[in-house]
């Protein structure tokens, strides 16, 4: 996540190097790499003069928090599937999206999962295991999903509100989720693996402001 940290530093120069600015908040989808970059930024800038806030939350709330100035920045992703809808919403909210990087889709699961030894996983391989997705509340449109392939008809789906619960479900039920593959072992631990999905789609991860 070196590139993410570098981007945070650029944002730090813009938002924090102003004497009258005493608060800095970031809202984000459930990305451990973004939390890690935020932690590094807070340590390097120092927490004596600034009040930091990080909100790991639902997609619509990320957008609303930036729109309503609760957060200076929001971290989320665009794909071929959701880009048209979300960019329309960004325009309505008078916010803009800046891409940080692109990545393929990975299957994230427990290292003792029956599929953990595979070099590549297919959607057919995953049919007998529960797909874990983040709950989006009343805005439960496929376009707000934090996971790729949100319209695919999985046999079993479990929704969760936070990363800790999702990690527990991976261990307890051999669940999986689809992600960017950029994982922070410092935060999630080293008991999990990210394996390429054969039917991968491109994720455009960036920030809104």
What is each PLM-predicted segment?
Residues 67-72, 136-193:
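Hydrophobic hinge/microswitch elements
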Residues 23-29, 74, 108, 132, ...:
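Short, well-ordered beta-strand segments
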Residues 13-65:
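N-terminal winged-helix
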Residues 39-41, 60-105, 109, 192-194:
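Short beta-strand-centered segments that line the small-molecule binding cleft or hinge
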Residues 1-17:
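Alpha-helical "hinge/linker" immediately C-terminal to small N-terminal DNA-binding modules
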Residues 34-37, 83, 123, 127-152:
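Secondary-structure junction motif
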Residues 18, 89-131:
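Flexible hinge/capping segments at coil-to-helix
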Residues 111, 193-209:
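A late-sequence structural motif
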């Amino acid at each position: 996540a070196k590139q993410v940290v570098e981007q945070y530093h650029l944002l730090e120069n813009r938002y924090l190097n102003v004497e009258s600015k005493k608060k800095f908040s970031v809202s984000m989808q459930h990305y451990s790499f973004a939390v890690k970059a935020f932690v590094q930024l807070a340590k390097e800038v120092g927490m004596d003069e600034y009040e930091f806030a990080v909100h790991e939350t639902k997609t619509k709330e990320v957008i609303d928090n930036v729109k309503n100035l609760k957060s200076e920045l929001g971290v989320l992703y665009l794909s071929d599937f959701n880009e048209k809808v979300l960019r329309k919403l960004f325009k309505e909210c008078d916010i803009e999206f800046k891409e940080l990087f692109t990545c393929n889709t990975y299957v994230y699961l427990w290292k003792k999962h029956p599929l953990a030894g595979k070099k590549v996983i297919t959607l057919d391989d995953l049919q007998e295991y529960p797909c874990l997705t983040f709950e989006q509340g009343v805005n439960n449109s496929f376009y707000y999903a934090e996971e790729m392939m949100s319209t695919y008809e999985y046999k079993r789906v479990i929704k969760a509100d936070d990363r800790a619960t999702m990690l527990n479900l991976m261990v307890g039920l051999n669940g999986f989720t689809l992600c960017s593959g950029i994982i922070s072992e410092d935060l999630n631990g080293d008991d999990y693996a990210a394996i390429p999905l054969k039917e991968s789609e491109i994720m455009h991860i960036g920030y809104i402001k």
